[in-house]
Structure formats: structure tokens, C-alpha cells
From Swiss-Prot:
It comes from the Eukaryota. InterPro entries: Pentatricopeptide_rpt (IPR002885), PPR-containing_protein (IPR050667), TPR-like_helical_dom_sf (IPR011990). GO terms for cellular component: mitochondrion. Belongs to the PPR family. P subfamily. It is found in: Mitochondrion. Keywords: Mitochondrion, Repeat, Transit peptide. This is Pentatricopeptide repeat-containing protein At1g11630, mitochondrial. PPR repeats lie at residues 74-108, 110-144, 145-180, 181-215, 216-250, 251-285, 286-320, 321-355, 356-386.
Length: 405
């Protein structure tokens, strides 16, 4: 009997487990379908917004979609809507969108909703509303934490109001009993560096030390960037020594900051010498390193060096991104090397990366001028297939091409 009972019990457990798996599988499929439906709706909304300038219509589109700041595409939707409204000077509509967004959230309201609104007000250059939203969090029954403080500092950065950022940093933590964290200090270092007061960032590092918060490579990277812009190279070396003292690894990301600064100052050869020195110390550059150098040499119209770096990059197993291709194609067209530009353009389009209409037109006309009309028409055909909205423009370009010889 005991044996039969165990068999029946096992059969019962197996049956229940099977039912649970089926139910769980059904639930997962339902969740996946819901997520897919949400993604499609959000992407359709984003597509609509990109072609809309009417403030009432923008508000209507946003309100008709259940937007969440926790979802990446929805954050883009809010950014596009706010930037468009601010560009057209529809500031009242910006307030209606963001304030309504917070107020209409179900209770308990999440701080993440307010954080997004604070940042977007800064992006719209409506910093007073960022501050007001931060101060009014109790009215919305939203907890105020260091996340809101960091969002307010970021809003100041976006509005480029460095004086207000300094006031927020000095006053708000004491006023609201908020303890700054690593992100707070890094934001303040960035404020000082962007405002041309990088030397003052040493005091922030000292404050971090007092609070037992260790600066990171990102903290020191901001300072290096700031000192490079101010051409204080002795200070750059000082920061590098500080990194060693704090036990912070000087990795390729730190060198990339220096390379970017040198390339922006039209010193790409110096940047390349720097990375050659790094490689001799057995530190490998990454794809960002090569992209920065390629962009730098292109901006100095040194195509030979740019193409050489591109070849080295690919041979070393790194994958160029779309911007790397676009930069090279533009510079090759500018230098009159349409044949090489065509090779890179084909590679780029195989990855579904198509340069801008103006660059593509430049390339097409350049090929035609070199008696490569067939190649030009082939390129037009591929672009027309991928981007149907520009078909009429490409038909005009194609009609103006000379007949093949």
C-alpha cells in the first residue's frame, strides 16, 4: 500500500508540475507578447513625434501612450517631445507635459518619474522649473533622495548654468538632509571642468576623501579633460600621479580622453605618438581609440594616416562603428578619392549604415565625374531600396547623371 501511495503521490506531483510549467510558459508567452506590443507602440509613437511640430498634437501623441521612464524608448520619446517643444518656444506645453506626467502617475509615485522631469526641464533650458520640481516633491508624495539631487545637478549642466549648479551643491544637501554620493561629486567635478575652473576640482576630491568616498577613473578622467582644455599639462601629469596614489588604474579609457583632447586641438600626430607609447607598455588600444584617431586625422585632412589606422584597426580584430565609416567616406569624397569611398560605402551599407543624403549625393556625382556612372546608378538603386522616403530626390539626382560612355 505504501508503495502504491508513493506512486500515486509521485504521479500527482508530476501532474501538478506539468500544469505549473504549462501555466508558467503560457504566462511567459503572454508577457513576451505584451512587451512586443509595448515596444511596437512606443516605436510608432517615436516615429510620429519626429515629424510633428504642433504642440497640441505632440501633447496628444504623448498622452495617448502609457509612457514609463524605466523603458528606454519611452525616455527617448520624452526627450524628443521636450526638445521639439522647447525649440519651437512652446514652454507652456513643456510644463503641461512634464507636470502632468508626474501628477498622473499612480500612487505610490516613483522618484524616477520626477528625476526624468527634472533633467528634461534642464534640457529645455527651463532650469527654474527643474528647481521647482525638486522643491515640490513632497506635494507629489515622492521621496527626495540623492537621485533627485544628482538629477538637479545634471539639469544645471544641460542648461550650462554653472553658478546655479554650485549653489545647488553647496545648499541643497544641508537644506534637505541629503548625503552626496560618488555621482554627486563627479557631477560637480564636471561642472567645474566645463566652466573653466578645473583646479577647483581638487577641493572636491579632498571632500570625497573626508567622506571616505574613493574617486574613480571617471572622476580623474573629467579632471584630465578639463586641464587639457585649459592647456595645463603639468596638472594633467599631477592628476595621473594622484590616480596612482589613490590606487586607480590608468586604463585605456583614461588615455582615450587624452587622445580625444589632443585630436580636438589638431594634434593627432601627438595623440598617435601617445598611443604608440601606451602599446609599448603592453596596454592595448580599443575601437574607441582608433575611431578617435581616425576622426582626428580626417579633420586635419591627413587621409593616408586615417586609412592606415583604419586598416590596422580591422586587422587587429576591431569593428569600426557607423561614425567611423561616415567620417572616412566624407573625408575621402572631400579628397577626391571616390573609388575608395565607394568601397567603404558598400561595406557600410552591408551593415545597414547609410551616410547622409548630402554625402551620398557627393559620392554619386564624384563617381559620375570619373566615368563611373554605372557604379553611381547602382549606389542610387541600393539607397532607394533602403530609404523610400528620399526616392523623389534620388530620381532627380539620377536624371542629372550623364549617360554611360
Amino acid at each position: 500500500m505504501a508503495f502504491l501511495f508513493r506512486i500515486r503521490t509521485s504521479e500527482f506531483i508530476l501532474q501538478k508540475a506539468t500544469q505549473f510549467r504549462l501555466k508558467s510558459s503560457s504566462s511567459s508567452i503572454f508577457t513576451l507578447k505584451s512587451l512586443t506590443s509595448k515596444q511596437k507602440k512606443s516605436r510608432d509613437t517615436l516615429s510620429l513625434l519626429k515629424s510633428e511640430n504642433n504642440p497640441d498634437r505632440i501633447l496628444e501623441i504623448c498622452r495617448s501612450t502609457s509612457l514609463s521612464p524605466d523603458y528606454h524608448v519611452d525616455r527617448i520619446i520624452f526627450s524628443v517631445a521636450v526638445v521639439t517643444l522647447a525649440r519651437e518656444k512652446h514652454f507652456v506645453a513643456v510644463s503641461q507635459l512634464l507636470d502632468g506626467f508626474i501628477q498622473n502617475q499612480p500612487d505610490p509615485k516613483s522618484e524616477s518619474f520626477a528625476v526624468r522631469a527634472i533633467i528634461l526641464y534642464g534640457r529645455a533650458n527651463m532650469l527654474d522649473r527643474s528647481i521647482q520640481t525638486f522643491r515640490n516633491l513632497e506635494q507629489y508624495e515622492i521621496p527626495r533622495t540623492v537621485k533627485s539631487l544628482n538629477a538637479l545637478l545634471f539639469a544645471c549642466l544641460m542648461a550650462k548654468d554653472y553658478k546655479e549648479a554650485n549653489r545647488v551643491y553647496l545648499e541643497m544637501p544641508k537644506m534637505y538632509g541629503i548625503e552626496p554620493d560618488l555621482e554627486t561629486y563627479n557631477r560637480m567635478i564636471r561642472v567645474l571642468c566645463e566652466s573653466g575652473s578645473t583646479s577647483s576640482s581638487y577641493s572636491i576630491v579632498a571632500e570625497m576623501e573626508r567622506k571616505w568616498i574613493k574617486p574613480t577613473a571617471a572622476s580623474f578622467g573629467l579632471m584630465i579633460d578639463g586641464f587639457y582644455k585649459e592647456e595645463k599639462f603639468d596638472e594633467v601629469r599631477k592628476v595621473m600621479r594622484m590616480m596612482d596614489e589613490f590606487g586607480v588604474h590608468v586604463g585605456v579609457a583614461t588615455y582615450n580622453i587624452m587622445i580625444q583632447c589632443l585630436c580636438k586641438r589638431k594634434k593627432s600626430a601627438e595623440a598617435k605618438a601617445l598611443i604608440d607609447g601606451v602599446m609599448s607598455c603592453r596596454m592595448r588600444p580599443n575601437s574607441v581609440t582608433y575611431s578617435l584617431l581616425i576622426h582626428g586625422f580626417c579633420s586635419e585632412e591627413n587621409l593616408d594616416e586615417a586609412m592606415n589606422l583604419f586598416e590596422v584597426m580591422v586587422c587587429n580584430g576591431y569593428k569600426p562603428d557607423s561614425e567611423c565609416y561616415f567620417t572616412l567616406i566624407h573625408c575621402l569624397c572631400k579628397g577626391g578619392d571616390f573609388e575608395t569611398a565607394l568601397i567603404l560605402c558598400r561595406e557600410s551599407m552591408e551593415k545597414n549604415w547609410v551616410p547622409s543624403f548630402s554625402v551620398m549625393k557627393w559620392l554619386v556625382n564624384g563617381l559620375a565625374s570619373r566615368s563611373k556612372v554605372d557604379e553611381a546608378k547602382e549606389l542610387i538603386a541600393v539607397v532607394k531600396e533602403k530609404f523610400t522616403r528620399n526616392v523623389d530626390l534620388w530620381n532627380e539626382v539620377e536624371a542629372a547623371l550623364p549617360l554611360p560612355q
